[in-house]
Design a protein with these regions (language model features):
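N-terminal binding-site loop/beta-alpha segment at the start of enzyme catalytic domains
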Residues: 1-84, 89-91
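Acidic (Asp/Glu)-rich catalytic clusters
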Residues: 7-9, 43, 69-76, 129-135, ...
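Local beta-strand N-terminus motif with an aromatic residue
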Residues: 12, 47-50, 78-79, 137, ...
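Beta/alpha (TIM)-barrel catalytic core signal, keyed to glycine-rich beta->alpha loops juxtaposed to Asp/Glu
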Residues: 33, 125, 129, 138, ...
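An active-site-proximal structural segment forming one wall of the substrate-binding cleft
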Residues: 113-136
């Protein structure tokens, strides 16, 4: 099962497999486990779509992808690869990496941000090299431009980076150019100057957060045939019972309304015997213009289940009850 992401007809799977775990996210993952994760992608989809980044493990995720695909003899056209660009390797001179302390385990390199016309070209060439040289990249984007701007980066540097990416597309080296960000307002602002092929939203829309203003922007993207990938879904795991909320520890006082909303959501799921994770994914697909979702797991056994969520359909009464209890807004 595939779907079209871009106006140019780039096909992807409706469930995209995230790869941050291959960069040793939070813990060192043995190579055999990484190999089994990649095997599971191909059991779940004839031609899987994956999402990675030079930032993941300071390039370790990309290296792991290249190595596993070679070991499994996957042809270069047997997988669709999306890479978020904007971070490059540098020597590790401190006890742990400086770019995200405490997040990555067992790394041999540090990473630094490099977003500009020439910087993004350097990031692209390094990504190709880490993947093994012979394997191309299908989809590219600038990694977290919202954080770049918040840290003092300039819009001009982002525009320069996208000029480089669209030159790569014109030269036939990539097939689509997009954007991914946690702050959707930044995506909307940049869309005034850059006509992306696709966008990825990383913190909304979700069951817990789906502002009307965002939905209006998504309708605009849909009308312009810009494919949307929803990688928020679980709010960092909080929605389904986790302690992390969108990249931070949830606070019962500060986030009291979200704790209550989660409790109501899980209660309705229990009443209707609906899997909370599956319904969260289905909610993503119910949003305007969403053609795919991105899911990440370090457990190979969960990959077939994640892939199956694309076919999940909860009863209409379930969604009506969520609206009645004001867990979600009326979509009409």
């Amino acid at each position: 099962m595939t779907t079209y992401l871009t106006r140019d007809g780039v096909e992807i799977t409706p469930v995209i497999f995230g790869t941050s775990c291959l960069g040793n996210l939070y813990r060192v993952l043995p190579y055999e486990t990484k190999l089994e994760i990649v095997r599971a992608w191909f059991r779940a989809a004839a031609k899987p779509t994956i999402d990675s980044a030079g930032k993941y493990g300071a390039g370790l995720a990309l290296e792991s992808i290249g190595r596993t695909l070679r070991d499994l003899a996957v042809p270069s056209d047997g997988i669709t690869v999306s890479v978020k660009l904007g971070w490059r390797r540098k020597p590790l001179t401190t006890p742990e990496p400086t770019f995200e302390p405490g997040v990555w385990a067992g790394l041999e390199y540090d990473a630094e941000q490099d977003i500009s016309y020439h910087g993004i070209m350097r990031c692209y060439e390094e990504a190709v090299e880490l993947l093994g040289g012979a394997r191309g990249i299908d989809l590219v984007s600038v990694h977290d431009p919202d954080e770049f701007l918040a840290g003092g980066g300039t819009v001009d540097d982002i525009l320069g980076a996208y000029r480089a990416l669209f030159e790569l597309k014109k030269a036939g080296r990539v097939r689509g150019v997009g954007i991914g960000a946690k702050d959707w307002h930044v995506i909307r602002g940049l869309y005034n100057d850059i006509k992306f092929d696709w966008v990825m939203f990383a913190c909304a829309p979700t069951i817990l957060r789906h502002p009307r203003e965002l939905r209006e922007f998504m309708h605009k993207l849909e009308a312009n045939r810009v494919g949307i990938i929803d990688s928020a879904l679980f709010n960092g795991g909080f929605l389904t019972g986790g302690s992390m909320l969108d990249y931070r520890k949830a606070d019962p006082v500060r986030d009291a309304k979200l704790f209550q909303k989660r409790a109501d959501y899980l209660a309705v799921c229990k009443d209707f015997s609906v899997d909370p994770a599956a319904a969260a994914v289905e909610f993503g697909f119910r949003q305007p213009g969403v053609v795919a979702v991105s899911l990440n797991t370090s457990d190979p056994a969960r990959i077939p289940m994640n892939a199956s969520y694309a076919q999940h359909h909860a009863p209409a009464e379930f969604w009506a009850e969520l609206i009645r209890r004001k867990v979600i807004d009326d979509e009409n």
